[in-house]
Amino acid sequence: APVWIRWFGLLFLTVFPLFPMWGFTMVKDAQYYISLLYFGVSFADILVDGTEKKKWWKQIVFLCASYGMILCRKEGRYLLVCALICLFFYHKKQWKLYLFTAVTGFMILFYIEQIYMPAHDIEEGRLAEGLSAPIQQTARYQRDHGAEVTEEERAILSELFDDYDQMGTAHYSPEISDAAKDQMISHPTKEQLKNYFKVWFAQFCKHPDTYFQAFFNQTYGYFYTDRKDRLGTPIIETTVGREQLSMEEFYMEIGFPPQLKGMREFLIGMIHFVTQFPLISLLYNAGFHGYLLLGYVVYLLGSKKGKRILLIVPTLLVFAVCILSPVNGELRYMLPVMIMLPLNLTWCAYQERESVAEKEEK
């Protein structure tokens, strides 16, 4: 990587206070984006050099990073599957590694979800967590066109949502879907879901503009650079011990060393201070990183070598998950995209160097 990218990466990940501050938190995000970064680095190493040199080291890093992704966040499994499929079709030399990763990853998840969790009475997460976009559209439709909802549609929706008649007024927030999602019953049947999506599609056909407005209200923060981001402050200030909210309310016995209180306060104050500076503040802006990601894609596609975009695929998938997330422009969801910034810049610089070398050879 060019020297300027190395220094930028060092400053971005260590001196700028966002990632050090998240390092103090005790939530799954930090472990997930660290696993993603290691996955990306080992991914790039395989694409460039294969696994001939230091074969065992590269494979172990790739495997550990893959397992970390699927264990820390549910989206990690989908990201890994898509990445492995792309690797298998466009970079087949290490197909045994991809197959081993997929099989062992499946075995780990099968044991945890089908054996360990049932044995310890641990329930799966609510299905509503993955349906933010359609639920928001249903809630907005009820708010704007409630009088047009037929009795049959109301009966189906009331069976799935606890307070459907008040969903659009009392529970709909254009940028946060949590209140609307909470109205969905915990364990809907396949028949209930089938009927719901029939109603959802029928209402979309009647008023598609309402659905588009609901979706854009929920996602514009990932493309709009003039939006003030939340920086994940509520979660950070709770999990670093600044807020009075006790972690015991979440059945977590977590303590905060009083001798580190000053450091925690310093990190929180620094991030709010740094984000006021021009240009630097863009590094803490979800919309800016969305455009950067699109810039990588355009540049790599323009290189006329489609395989070069493979490294960006994991970041693109994370960004797609952000768009479908329950909170608009939430920087916490963008952390995996942001931490890949130095690696993605390095990859583009490497491709430029390779292109120049190829032209000189000709």
What kind of feature is each model-predicted range?
Residues 3-7, 49-67, 96-99:
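Short hydrophobic alpha-helices at membrane interfaces in multi-pass membrane enzymes
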Residues 33-50, 62, 66, 83-84, ...:
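Specific aromatic-rich, kink-prone transmembrane helix
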